[in-house]
């Protein structure tokens, strides 16, 4: 038994040593950045209501993909999350939906199921095809029109786009349409963020992440430690620390610890089981912790999905390590690509 552990440690040490040797200032010089859409056969479609400030992003692998999930936030809004429990029978899912609308938006998955069924995809029960669609939502009802939430029609439209006209973009699109950060003092001093992605390739291995940043806390450049988004000063011209604000307002009864969640999806072309993907998803949360402070609060629904869409052989711990880094970088992209909206300035407005 001791010899087995020794062999495993040596394999992991060799993999991580290769990663460190190739790395510069955190990001690997050996990496080649690729578009997130290069990780085939995953399809991505988005739709949003720019007037109402909400939308959804759909990731589809119509023939099925192994999926894992790790939830660290205390207030998630999710659908069919138990499908990714290693104890459950299903080994693959057909789609992942990220949506606005909080719990109201969970109906978007019905539209994705309809699209998949129409195209002949799903688990064959002998009586009907049942597409397995999992979903997690952000709370964006405090932005735009709270009466408008993603539903079956919006989910269907995003799924159709994923098949017929893939349209993934970073910024105020899809689920990122109504995303904001720095909300502890109220929406008046919060900032606009969005959805972001970052993906890399090392040899045959591809690892990427899509993140919608809708956190209670602040966002930091994980490479420099500089705060780039979050709680605004009262004159709306600069940034202040959410953590410091929390310390000063510890006895306050009107803290607004509501309406938050950061959702991330790690995508890889490496072959893993859903048990392994749950571990990779858990490691991915390290990327959130590097870039968002505070994170994983009781008011956040912070969740990381991990998806395997290929057959490349790769070390699980290496992919988990890379997953954390691509999440941290995707968070920065979500901030940098966002545009001001609904009275909330973006990072570009502070430069």
Say what each PLM segment does.
Residues 14-24:
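Bacterial N-terminal signal peptides
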Residues 2-4, 21, 301, 346:
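Intrinsically disordered, low-complexity segments
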